Amino acid sequence: MPSVKVFNIKGEAVGQTELSDSHFGVKPSTSLVHSVVVAQEANKRTTKANTKTRGEIAGGGRKPWKQKGTGRARQGSIRSPQWVGGGIVFGPRKERNYSVKINRKAKQAALFMVLSDRVSHDKFVVVDNFPIDTPKTKSFAGWMKVLPFGRKSLVVIPASNPTLLRMVRNLKNVQLVTVNALHVADLVKYPTVIFEQPSLAAFEKLYSKA
């Protein structure tokens, strides 16, 4: 059963906590993690580009010239795709759906694998508490400097906290997420994961049946 140190905001080790093997001691599978990340990124994608077909462009109802006798190629509408300003063939459409289905068990397994990897490489940190009595970005940045890990970190808290969010949102190398919003795609972007100690209990409860 893996165990990690618990730190306070001064960077001092104040204890140790054990982690469950089923969640933090899982053997990694690069291919599974990759497929889940690709799917989660695809599911975030929205379609903005939208081209018009010849049926959606205004005008072009009249035949530009008669069928025969002009010496020119026959044309039926100035909104045909070969005309400048005509409809687009096979262009991007806003109704295109990029979403990819992910099995729940596969998504959970990939999540446990990435967390297990962070634990095995000493990139998983537990902090006893983030005090919010001084809700300043400067305060949170100061904690990040003294804690024993890299500055670029994903911080996991048990539930939504608007005060902490305000403290973190201007720090470009720190992202704040709640336990139930923790995704593999977010985890792989940050080399270090920081769990506030109550988040561990919330995580274990959320995935107790996994």
What residue ranges belong to the model's regions?
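A short, flexible low-complexity segment enriched in Lys/Arg and Gly/Pro that occurs
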Residues: 30-68
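Glycine/serine-rich anion-binding loops at beta->alpha junctions
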Residues: 54-91
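Extended polybasic, low-complexity segments that bind anionic RNA or targeting/receptor surfaces
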Residues: 1-46, 92-210
